[in-house]
Amino acid sequence: MRFLTSGESHGPQLTVIIEGVPANLKITAEDINEEMFKRQGGYGRGRRMKIEKDGVEIVSGVRNGYTLGSPVTIVVTNDDFTHWRNIMGVAPISEEEQEQMKRTISKPRPGHADLIGGIKYNHRDLRNVLERSSARETAARVAVGAVCKILLKQLGINVLSRVVEIGGIKDDTDYDLDTIKKHEDSNDVRVVNEDIAQEIRAKIDQAKKDGDSLGGVVQVIVKNMPVGIGSYVHYDRKLDGRIAQGVVGINAFKGVSFGEGFKAAEKPGSQIQDPILYNDEEGYTRASNHLGGLEGGMSNGMPIVVNGVMKPIPTLYKPLASVDIETKEPFKATIERSDSCAVPAASIVCEHAVAFEITKTLLEEFQSNYMEQLQQQVDERRLRNIEF
């Protein structure tokens, strides 16, 4: 399975083509839209999300509610394009017209792709960089992940997420999975503890007032994975390696860990390795899950626990020092419409990025021309964990 997205932040639409979806997967636009709606929420979002209504249109690869096995194409319309039609249109315009629009950007934002992208692609107008490097593209990736979550759910695999920290305020209690599932969308900062949610909202409000932004940590959990997905044989087939690439490939994500993550460096091996148990109903299992469901680059049947670190958004309403690339004189960085905190929304994006990497690796592990074939092989692998 693979996908390709296209489109700019203020262009007419985002398009994604997904190749490798098995035939006979039941899917509708409404199923995908449920996930798209979650991405638009979250405390601290900017005005853009009041404009967009991210409903998708499936334009290929699905007939009468079922996938065909051919590439699935999904379109997400950018409603805000109506305000940017001349600026972001494909037809050429004169330099005078462009100057009158006053949307040319020459003062790059620290922490963003503006300056480096301009150097790399020789763009004097840095809008040509920020339009594609914008996190708006993650809407297309959530659409991909939504398709993957539908497929995984049919196989009995569930993916959920939560926020564990924003701006240094933590809700990192090791809750049981049922509690996390019950509360994952119960409030607009996506933490379990409502008292902590109130503290976080106040911190976000203060950051907005100060013209600043906040980052945080999100957690994704994958339940009921069959064992042995991934590989210990080659580095590029290790499941944790693939998930890590998928997570840090999300805009503003700067780190990833699994299970107890970096805390493992503080403890002896006897407190980090997970003792192996066996029972007739489940087969091989573990007494704990410090390693986050991954051993030797493969799933071990325990919940896969992924932690992602998101830096604060680089667009600031009290901008940092920058340089005008035309005059080389010092200036404050360009201000673009942005969020004060996008960590709750980013937890949804991270959830869907992980869902894609899990699905991609599953489809490589088993023959997957059609769903019935895939389901049979997943069932056989689960049985093997008992009979081995």
UniProtKB/Swiss-Prot annotation:
**Transmembrane intervals:** none
Q: Does the keyword Transmembrane helix apply?
A: no
Q: What reaction gets catalysed by this protein?
A: 5-O-(1-carboxyvinyl)-3-phosphoshikimate = chorismate + phosphate
User: What are the protein's UniProt keywords?
Assistant: Amino-acid biosynthesis, Aromatic amino acid biosynthesis, FAD, Flavoprotein, FMN, Lyase, NADP
* Enzyme Commission (EC) number: 4.2.3.5
What top-level class of enzyme does the UniProt entry assign?
Answer: lyase
**Cofactor binding remark:** Reduced FMN (FMNH(2)).
InterPro entries for this protein = Chorismate_synth, Chorismate_synth_AroC_sf, Chorismate_synthase_CS
What PANTHER family does the database record attribute to this sequence? CHORISMATE SYNTHASE (PTHR21085:SF0)
Family statement: Belongs to the chorismate synthase family.
Q: What does this protein do?
A: This reaction introduces a second double bond into the aromatic ring system.
Listed name of the protein: Chorismate synthase
